[in-house]
A protein has these predicted regions:
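Ampiphathic alpha-helical segments that act as solvent-exposed interaction surfaces
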Residues: 24-25, 71-86, 123-132
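Short, extreme N-terminal segment that most often corresponds to the first beta-strand
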Residues: 1-31
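Acidic, proline/glycine-rich low-complexity IDRs
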Residues: 98-132
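Short, intrinsically disordered low-complexity segments
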Residues: 30-76, 80, 85
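A short amphipathic beta-strand at an alpha->beta junction
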Residues: 84-97
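Beta-strand-enriched cores of mature, soluble protein domains
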Residues: 4-7, 41-45, 90-91
Length: 132
């Protein structure tokens, strides 16, 4: 089973926009909107509140699929386009040869994404499940 839980606050840049007038916030958000519109499996929720944009989604599949790959790729692409974005994507694939018993977290900040091991739920077989 593949499970993804993700959230991402979308911000055009992490730089002070007053000091960087070359950053076109409208273009950044238009690019994000176009990216989202092109998704084949658009199952994310976009929340606009208080002049902020927030994306959240979850995916639950029996196996790794095109949908899981597309959603991870979209998360990474938003981070590259809107470099001020930050968030977490929790990922578990119980068929993964290396990480079958642990959640991995894709941490997004300052235009980059980095995979990390989750310490709160991993190893799953000990921290959230018990088998005799």
């Amino acid at each position: 089973m593949v499970t993804i839980y993700a959230w991402l606050e979308i911000r055009a840049t992490y730089l002070d926009e007053d000091l960087h007038p070359e950053i076109d916030e409208k273009k950044v958000f238009d690019d994000i909107d176009n990216l989202i519109k092109k998704l084949k499996y658009n199952e994310l929720k976009v929340i606009e509140k208080n002049y902020s944009r927030f994306v959240q989604f979850s995916v639950m599949e029996n196996h790794k699929t095109e949908r899981t790959e597309e959603m991870i790729s979209m998360y990474e692409n938003i981070t590259k386009i809107a470099t001020g974005s930050y968030g977490l994507l929790y990922y578990l694939d119980d068929e993964d040869e290396v990480y079958s018993d642990e959640f991995r977290v894709l941490v997004s900040k300052k235009g980059k994404c980095e995979w990390k091991r989750d310490e709160n739920f991993s190893p799953c077989s000990i921290l959230i499940e018990e088998f005799d």
